[in-house]
From Swiss-Prot:
Subunit structure: Forms a heterotetramer with UvrA during the search for lesions. Interacts with UvrC in an incision complex.
Primary residence: cytoplasm
SUPFAM superfamilies membership: C-terminal UvrC-binding domain of UvrB (SSF46600), P-loop containing nucleoside triphosphate hydrolases (SSF52540)
Keyword Protein biosynthesis carried by entry: no
The keyword Nucleotide-binding appears for this protein: yes
BP term (GO), one: nucleotide-excision repair
Protein's UniProt name: UvrABC system protein B
Matching PANTHER family: UVRABC SYSTEM PROTEIN B
Keywords, sorted A to Z: ATP-binding, Cytoplasm, DNA damage, DNA excision, DNA repair, Excision nuclease, Nucleotide-binding, SOS response
Length: 670
């Protein structure tokens, strides 16, 4: 029987959470396809979803709008479900330049990519968990709608080994080569195997800390054991083990041969079309490139850019959707879309950009028309394939509300009793001087201020003006990378400065309890940055403070302002009524400042053996850029292997633990 979800938390549902959990569960059990959870900032939406997952015991996919929020969700879910499979599935590219052609300058840009091995391992681990068990939560980015290997072919390619089975050594080695594992008797690493007499050591592609030892005796599997690849220490013997392919795109030989025949037929047809239109250069280019790919596929079983032939390799017809992570999710799975007002439009936008680039490649003879089927899912395909869905947002868009039939589950009351900010509207004419006096009031009592402007120029001028008047102020803009952004937010919370000025400070997941004032300049200028949703999100940044307040500077109240003010007041009234009825006194949030830099670090909680020395030195690396972190990880891995070769296993294990902590930090900030 499959393992059940076990929720680990010191807290019990409170505020609006019990009612939200009950209604979401009832809706799912009644077969509702779409539900919306409208949860205000700081109301514990993730905890509510965790309770629903634990009670229903169904495999779940959680979609987040970006890698940073995905890492944050992954870390939270790891803490809630330490005994279950919580997996992470985001794009494994540190850098990606797709192939493209610019006709105006006759420039062809080759595909160039840098793959993050650790994230690739986590992706393989995610699909393995979905295929093997039911107690799975996969936290994914929009990468989940991009093409992946066909799950049926992936399952067919697996190598099952059981104790006592009859199989000779050569057959095992041949199968490992088909799974794209490489033999390496010197450097034993993920996705490789080594042979020593009748003993084969295999390092599974989806694992980062356990390897398999297969001991043969006269064409019979005598023993299967799991061991630590670093120390060689045997952890346990197992009666059976399944080895998964090294990549999601592995394909059986017979399917490759069939695909090659289909590609030849398409090439002949396409050449006729190009010649009929006097496109001789394009015909020559297409023939040369495709023939080269066919030769490589025949010799090696794959070629560079093999994903462009995915229609034939997965056996799908023209125009059919590609296999994606959704094909690995069981039919009764659950989909949770976090920050749905941002994530849903992202899903809709991916297909069009990809299509425009590929059409140019096809038109100018760089690719066959079938390459157009190597694409992300269309929005309609996503809708058709998505299982029962819960949309989670503080500001759901019309799409979610329409899909849920207007039946929105409110989670307005916070367990802490905190109220939504008080809102004031003040004239634009004196906004800068008025803001300066408000900042001084807040700075005097060690509180922080967020200021949002409409343009970059205004943000720069305001920052300069405030600095001239002796205020400690910093400016946040789009050129700042994720790590530096996290550093600035951390410094604001620590009190290194008092005021943060920016243009788009409504960023979801910006969690700063020290901020007691949000000032929105030119709030009466209708547009994207001053829409109802943007205003509510920005006002919500002051909702984690006991004295939270939002000042909207405008000479008139626009429709968006009126809606945002009315919605905030509705929430505040409901919160006050609940607090009065239950005798709750609002409490401020004391969130550890280090937390914001440790997204996903809990991922490694409970792994490995012995004392974790890694947590101590990790602080030294908190402010490193992703590139510097990657170099540090490589340096530590090199030292670790040196210690292992010198049989200094204690030192090697300590470095291994430190590398794992740094990898988790790298995921969080990349």
């Amino acid at each position: 029987m499959s393992k059940a979800f076990t929720l680990n938390s010191d807290f019990k549902p409170a505020g609006d959470q019990p009612e939200a959990i009950r209604r979401l569960k009832e809706g799912l059990e009644d077969g509702l396809a779409h539900q919306t959870l409208l949860g205000v900032t700081g109301s514990g939406k993730t905890f509510t979803i965790a309770n629903v997952i634990a009670d229903l015991n169904r495999p779940t996919m959680m979609l987040a709008p970006n890698k940073t929020l995905a890492a944050q969700l992954y870390g939270e879910m790891k803490e809630f479900f330490p005994e279950n499979a919580v997996e992470y599935f985001v794009s494994y590219y540190d850098y990606y330049q797709p192939e493209a052609y610019v006709p105006s300058s006759d420039t062809f840009i080759e595909k160039d990519a840098s793959v993050n091995e650790h994230i690739e391992q986590m992706r393989l681990s995610a699909t393995k968990a979905l295929l093997e068990r039911r107690d799975v939560i996969v936290v994914a980015s929009v990468s989940a709608i991009y093409g992946l290997g066909d799950p049926d072919l992936y399952l067919k390619m697996m190598l099952h080994l059981t104790q006592g089975m009859l199989i000779d050594q050569r057959a095992i080695l041949r199968r490992l080569a088909e799974l794209q594992y490489a033999r390496n008797d010197q450097a034993f690493q993920r996705g490789t195997f080594r042979v020593r007499g009748e003993v084969i050591d295999i390092f599974p592609a989806e694992s980062d800390e356990i390897a398999l030892r297969v001991e043969l005796f006269d064409e019979e599997v005598e023993r299967l054991s799991l061991f630590d690849p670093l120390t060689g220490h045997v952890l346990q013997t197992v009666p059976r083990y399944t080895i998964y392919p090294k990549t999601h795109y592995v394909t059986p030989r017979e399917r490759i041969l069939q695909a090659m025949e289909d590609i030849k037929v398409e090439l002949a047809d396409r050449k006729k079309v190009l010649l009929a239109n006097d496109k001789l250069v394009e015909e020559q280019r297409l023939s040369q490139r495709t023939q080269f790919d066919l030769e490589m596929m025949n010799e090696l079983g794959y070629c560079s850019g093999i994903e462009n032939y995915s229609r034939y390799l997965s056996g799908r017809g023209p125009g059919e959707p590609p296999p994606t992570l959704f094909d690995y999710l069981p039919a009764d799975g659950l989909l949770v879309i976090d920050e749905s007002h941002v994530t849903v439009p992202q899903i809709g936008g991916m297909y069009r950009g990809d299509r425009a680039r590929k059409e140019t490649l096809v038109e100018y003879g760089f690719r066959l028309p079938s390459a157009l089927d190597n694409r992300p899912m269309k929005f309609e395909e996503f809708e058709a394939l998505a299982p029962q869905t819960i949309y989670v947002s503080a500001t759901p868009s019309h799409y979610e509300l329409e899909k849920s039939g207007g039946d929105v589950i409110d989670q307005v009351v916070r367990p802490t009793g905190l109220l939504d900010p008080i809102i004031e509207v003040r004239p634009v004419g004196t906004q800068v001087d008025d803001l300066l006096s408000e900042i001084r009031l807040r700075a005097a009592i060690n509180e922080r201020v967020l200021v949002t402007t409409l343009t970059k120029r205004m943000a720069e001028d305001l920052t300069e003006y405030l600095q001239e008047h002796g205020e400690r102020v910093r400016y946040l803009h789009s050129d700042i990378d994720t790590v530096e952004r996290v550093e600035i937010i951390r410094d604001l919370r620590l009190g290194e400065f008092d005021v943060l000025v920016g243009i788009n400070l409504l960023r979801e997941g910006l969690d700063m309890p020290e901020v007691s004032l949000v000032a929105i300049l030119d709030a009466d200028k209708e547009g994207f940055l001053r829409s109802e949703r943007s205003l509510i999100q920005t006002i919500g940044r002051a909702a984690r403070n006991l004295r939270g307040k939002a000042i909207l500077y405008g000479d008139r109240i626009t429709a968006s302002m009126a809606k945002a003010i009315s919605e905030t007041e509705r929430r505040r009234e409901k919160q006050e009524a609940y607090n009065t009825e239950h005798g709750i006194v609002p409490q401020g949030i004391n969130k550890k400042i280090s937390d914001i830099l440790q997204l996903g670090q809990s991922a490694n909680k409970g792994k490995g053996r012995g004392n974790r020395k890694a947590a101590e030195p990790a602080a030294r690396y908190e402010l490193m850029t992703p590139k510097a972190l990657e170099l540090k990880i490589r340096e530590l891995e090199s030292k670790m292997l040196t210690h292992a070769q010198n049989l200094e296993f204690e030192e090697a294990a300590a470095l291994r633990d430190e590398v794992q902590v740094l990898r988790a930090q790298f995921i969080a900030i990349s």
